[in-house]
Amino acid sequence: MSPLLPSFPPAVLALADGSIFPGYSIGAPGETTGEVVFNTALTGYQEIITDPSYSRQIVTLTYPHIGNVGVNAQDAESDRIHAAGLVVKDLPKRVSSFRSEGALDDYLTKAGVLGIAGIDTRKLTRILRDKGAQSGAIVAGKVGDSYETLVSKALELAKAFPGMSGLDLAKVVTTQKVYEWREAEWNLHGADGKPAYGTLDTGKPINKVVAYDFGVKRNILRMLTERGCQLTVVPAQTTAAEVLAMNPDGVFFSNGPGDPGPCDYAIAAAKEIIEKGVPTFGICLGHQIMGLAAGAKTLKMKFGHHGANHPVKDLDTGRVAITSQNHGFAVDANTLPDNIRVTHVSLFDGSLQGLAWKDKPELCFQGHPEASPGPHDIAYLFDRFVELMNAASKKEGE
């Protein structure tokens, strides 16, 4: 028998291995497919589902109560929900937050995104941990629909999804036009005494930075702006020649979804920009792009890193930082060229987390120093990028 609640439409999550999870719909009706992953963050569900890096992924949140504080426009990391679907244990119907502008289920429904609640997320997470991330599908029906019909359709869809390997999604989620960004970090006590985002402080030294948008999160742009970066955001397929013609002090390669391997346009651009010696910083997919541009290889991880409690060791200082992570691919440390050194490693599995070039002003990091959600222990990497740009400018002036 299905444990569906009579007042909610029925929904089913199916995995490619045949696992079935009946529950109830908390979003739009219909069907969706994607790679099913789990995220261990306790907070930040709105930031997670609006992160473009989750494109074509069905996100399982391991924390049991999701939706407590509702949603609001300020916490979105992009202009829409990018996750293919959302899986939670329990959706509280009472929202409690002075910042809330609506409920999570309404947010999903208006965006046309499927969600399922009422399932055993602990069991699901253990399957994904032991067997690895899997193709999956959510099918959400109407009140009174047959549970058996939903199951057969969900299984069919789950087994048909090809997985994330080989998918170039950066050019799918990227901006379609060049734009300027001037919004800085959130301040509980803004200019008028009310919570608000800051703006670029033109009274301080400014660095002109071109940011490649492979699926960039807004909080990354805010943290760069907070540090005096005057940002020009460009589409993923912008050539190195176009970027270099802007005469930037630095170049940033953003986070993003999918497999870095097929992004040959980005790899070629990164290689040319790095060879020119322009200070460059990459995060997440941008980190992988820079690694590939240097001649290293990437690999698909078993279930990836998705959460806000991942310990990472800085090999230069010995310091351990708790970081936010969201990636299913990683740079293979065994394939690095001699001119690159490893700067950070994961204390969960020893995987490569950070790189620096020995002969050029370049660095990159696999995790998310901007967090959102998560800790800011590793935010000093933004400062290092600014230091690289300042040092390069000083050298040019000598």
UniProtKB/Swiss-Prot annotation:
L-glutamine binds at S53, G256, G258, L285, Q288, N326, G328, F329. Residues 1-204 are annotated as: CPSase. The active site is at C284, H368, E370. Residues 208-395 form the Glutamine amidotransferase type-1 domain. GO terms for biological process: 'de novo' pyrimidine nucleobase biosynthetic process; 'de novo' UMP biosynthetic process; glutamine metabolic process; L-arginine biosynthetic process. Gene3D superfamilies: 3.40.50.880, Carbamoyl-phosphate synthase small subunit, N-terminal domain. Pathway: Amino-acid biosynthesis; L-arginine biosynthesis; carbamoyl phosphate from bicarbonate: step 1/1; Pyrimidine metabolism; UMP biosynthesis via de novo pathway; (S)-dihydroorotate from bicarbonate: step 1/3. It catalyses: hydrogencarbonate + L-glutamine + 2 ATP + H2O = carbamoyl phosphate + L-glutamate + 2 ADP + phosphate + 2 H(+). Pfam families: CPSase_sm_chain, GATase. The keyword Cell membrane does not apply. GO terms for molecular function: ATP binding; carbamoyl-phosphate synthase (glutamine-hydrolyzing) activity; glutaminase activity. It is an enzyme of class 6 (ligase). Its EC number is 6.3.5.5. Small subunit of the glutamine-dependent carbamoyl phosphate synthetase (CPSase). CPSase catalyzes the formation of carbamoyl phosphate from the ammonia moiety of glutamine, carbonate, and phosphate donated by ATP, constituting the first step of 2 biosynthetic pathways, one leading to arginine and/or urea and the other to pyrimidine nucleotides. The small subunit (glutamine amidotransferase) binds and cleaves glutamine to supply the large subunit with the substrate ammonia. Composed of two chains; the small (or glutamine) chain promotes the hydrolysis of glutamine to ammonia, which is used by the large (or ammonia) chain to synthesize carbamoyl phosphate. Tetramer of heterodimers (alpha,beta)4. Belongs to the CarA family. NCBIfam families: CPSaseIIsmall, PRK12838.1. This is Carbamoyl phosphate synthase small chain.
